[in-house]
Amino acid sequence: MAEVSEEAVLAGVREELAQLKVPGAAEATMETEWRDLDIDSLELVELVTALEDRFDVKIADGELRSITGGGDAVRLTLSLANEPASA
């Protein structure tokens, strides 16, 4: 799989937030915090599930609490998507 870029993941976060009908989704940045967008825990789970599907990654349930905003979601997804494949 080709390396995934930060811009691609951030665009994916914005698109998935828009699918969830989150106001302000298009303006989400690396600095955006979920509380600024009034994202609740169910929406966060739906966002993470969508990112897992989109980028073919698995985000552990324990990591959900560490995802407090756009930057966290992008960095975690990026690191998982660009991990070397296990042989």
Say what each PLM segment does.
Residues 2-39, 43-49, 54-87:
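Phosphopantetheine-dependent thiolation modules in NRPS/PKS and related acyl-activating systems
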